[in-house]
Each structure stands twice: as structure tokens, then as C-alpha cells.
Amino acid sequence: MQPSTLQALTKRVLATQHVSNDDYCILKRFGLWWHDAPITLYTDGEQILIKTPCYKEGIKLNTALVLAVKENNYDLIVLFTEWGANINYALLSVNKEHTRNLCRKLGAKEGLEASEVLRFFFETKRHKTSSNIILCHELFSNNPFLQNVNMVELRMIIYWELKDLTTNLIVNEDSFTEMLTKYWYGIAVKYNLKEAIQYFCQEYEHLNEWRLICALSFNNVFDLHEICNTMNIDMNINKMMRLACMRDNNFLTIYYCFALGADINRAMYGSVSNFRIENMFFCMDLGADVFEESLELAERHGYSVIVDILSLKIYKANPILLSKETDPEKINTLLKNYYPKNMLAYDICNVDNYL
């Protein structure tokens, strides 16, 4: 959407330019100033993002509008609307009658449909940066508009985003606010958004175990290392390994738990039980040798593929993995694009049999 006035267009063009510190007075005069710093506008594909030192990674134009409304910043409400922000979304954070009247003058409706609230929620959360995730948490926590949406639909959105979690701690018994807090915290860990992780860690100490579970589930060995070295962990290492093994291809966090002393045979047995074939092969690479027990378990579950795999007597540990390294950078380098040696041996055996 193009700005509606020449002045708004001029401001938009100016906001895309590099301006030296000496000319900041021009930006202030044009109203391109927010949180004691200049506003920068840039495009990322089809979306418009607003940058300030507080939001150096950028936030969407509609999100910036909602924040400006929350702060009752009338000049920026008008400016962002002229730049194309949807003034109806202002209703999500309006907290003063004077601001509500301004939004009406700019064309805002009297209320938002539940579908519109969900659309804004869905669009806003797509921008995976620390500043945006923290802002989403602040905007949506205790927001009365979210109480009116279809809770089943909202929970489905959250479950889908966190579908790789190995345990479901976002349960129906959680309060609505607690559910959302866990959601944003989980997103921060999933995408290793360090500033957001630190924010939630400081604000919600009672969710330390949730952070640990997310790190294990999302294969975030960097955060797992920090948790194990800076926090008191009230979880057995074998339970940590079990959580890591429940999602296939979680080689980084499986290896880290192995390096800390987790029982690799128990990990292989659990991988077989949950039909995590890649993890099973990786456990073999790490020295697991409970082949007969795992074969019997696979037969009981009717896992014919695993029965076929374990019927072969060709598997052995990969020596390069047995050093038990705990440096996350070295682990990441070691296992980046790693293909289990024993899986390769099985593949070769299958090809030979086929030929």
C-alpha cells in the first residue's frame, strides 16, 4: 500500500536512507524518532519492517502500530497508518479513550472478529527474532481480545509450532497466560534466540525445566550446554537422554547426554520402542550393543523394518564419536550433516543383497 499523502511518502523515503548523526534533528522534526532513536524502514520481500535500536532485527509494520497504540504515541499511530498499517489491529492494545477516538478517525472498526485476532497472532509470530518474540509476549499476555478466540484453534496453532516437543507440557490445565508464556519461551529455544531466552529465563525461573525440555527436544545443544553449566538441573541424565531420543535425528543433544554419562544402551532401547530408526543407528555408532534385547522389543511391537535391521550382525561403534566431547561448537562441527556409520553399513548390505 502506498502512503496516502506526499508528506507521508517523503517520510517513508527518508526513513529508508542512511542519515548521519549530525542530521538526526531532521528525523526528529519529521517524526521519524522512537525510543530516543531514529526509525529505519526497510522491506523484506513483500513485508515492511520497522527498525530502531530497541528492535534492531526489525518488527512488522502492523506490530509497530500496535506497540505505538499501546504507548499512546499519536504521531506514530498516524504515520504507520499512512504507511499502510491496518488501523483495525490498533484495537488489540488501545488503552485510552483519546487514543481510541484517534483510531476511529483513522478508520478503525468498533471491534475485531476472532478470525482477525488469530490472523494478527499468526502473522506476527512468523518473524522469528528475539526482539519480536519478546514483543509478542508483551502484547499478547493478558490481552482480553485473545480470550474471545477459538481456544481449540489457538491451541492447534501452538501445538503445530511446537510439534517436535517430546513431551506435552502445554496441557489443558495450564492457564491461558501460562500456555502462551511457554509457547514464546519454546519458540525462543527452538530458534536459539539468545536474547529472548535470557529474557524468559530471568522473568520466569519456574519454567527452567520447560527450557531444558525444549533444548533437548529441539536439538539445541548450545542452550543445553548453557543450562547444564549455569543452572541447577533437577533431572536425571538418563531421563534427559530419553527426551532427546524421542525425536528422530536429534544427534546433537543425544551426543551431549552421552558425553555426560547417559546409558547409551538404554537410549537405543528407547529409540527402538519409539520407532526412531535414525536415533537407533546413532546409538549404535556411540557404542550401544543391546542388539538381542532390541530385536525382541521390535518383534513385540511388530516393527518389521527394525527387525530386519537388527537381524544383521554387522554393527559396531564409530571410534571418532567416543571421545565424549562437551563443547557445543565442536559437537556441532563433528555432527553437522552426520550420517550414521551403521546406517551406511546397512544401506550397503541392502544394495549388495539386491545385486
From Swiss-Prot:
Function: Plays a role in virus cell tropism, and may be required for efficient virus replication in macrophages.
Signal peptide extent: none
GO BP terms, alphabetized: taxis
The keyword NAD is annotated on this UniProt entry: no
Organism: African swine fever virus (isolate Pig/Kenya/KEN-50/1950) (ASFV)
Name of the protein in its database record: Protein MGF 360-3L
InterPro entries, A to Z: ASFV_MGF360 (IPR002595)
Keyword rRNA-binding among record annotations: no
Disulfide bonds, paired cysteine numbers: none
